[in-house]
């Protein structure tokens, strides 16, 4: 993989502050970092030179893991897919309530936002109801947007639930989809390695959990119907019915349009 964990090229042209210096193990990493610096100085997206970033890897599999690509607009996705018609895309879906709270915990831990009263609904809303948070909080809309452009055989949805339950099997499934060697062992990290394991998480009270669940009630049900898999169990975690009728989902297109609009 690239020496930078999240490139953020298509959303911020890689002009982001990083908490730690990038890896630089060999000549390939050095070439990548030098090319990335030049590329990020350009005024707009340059797909040709972006593709050249991965040339040092030659025939090896390589890619770009950037969670915020889930917020890219249809136009940017279209351009990417037209330039890379055989691009394989993976989306890791997570229960919106859990994802939102985990993200707030991370932001507080890294002092991206000020600590707040986690028991106060108004304080929670002030930190939660931000454009950047909401853009990444609707996995059903993200999947729908990418599916409009990526061929079905080149797009896969995986679930954070599977990462928690059986990380080894999830890793094998992803490697199989990518066409990688399933028997090759990682010489550095195990499948269940979690760099965030030591991070202190904010306490999620029952009151706030219920509040967030009500906010995401429709999205939880939409994910269950549209994404399937472990998402089918998400509504029941919060006491919501898992029975779905066509008319319950009839205005999903309004939700997708709204998410596209704020993107």
Model-identified regions with their sequence ranges:
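PAPS-dependent sulfotransferase catalytic core
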Residues: 1-66, 83, 87, 99-103, ...
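The conserved 3'-phosphoadenosine-5'-phosphosulfate
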Residues: 5, 86, 94-97, 123, ...
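Short catalytic/ligand-binding loop motif for oxyanion handling, primarily in non-cytosolic enzymes
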Residues: 9-11, 18-19, 69-74, 97-102, ...
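Membrane-proximal basic amphipathic "stem/tether" segments
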Residues: 18-37, 239-263
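Surface-exposed cleft-lining segments at the edges of enzyme active sites
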Residues: 34-37, 64-69, 121-135, 199-208
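Acidic-and-aromatic substrate-binding clefts and catalytic sites of carbohydrate-active enzymes
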Residues: 39-44, 69-73, 133-134, 162-166
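Generic structural signal for well-ordered alpha-helices
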Residues: 47-51, 77, 143-144, 220
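ATP-dependent NMP and nucleoside kinases share a basic, alpha-helical "lid"
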Residues: 71-90, 140
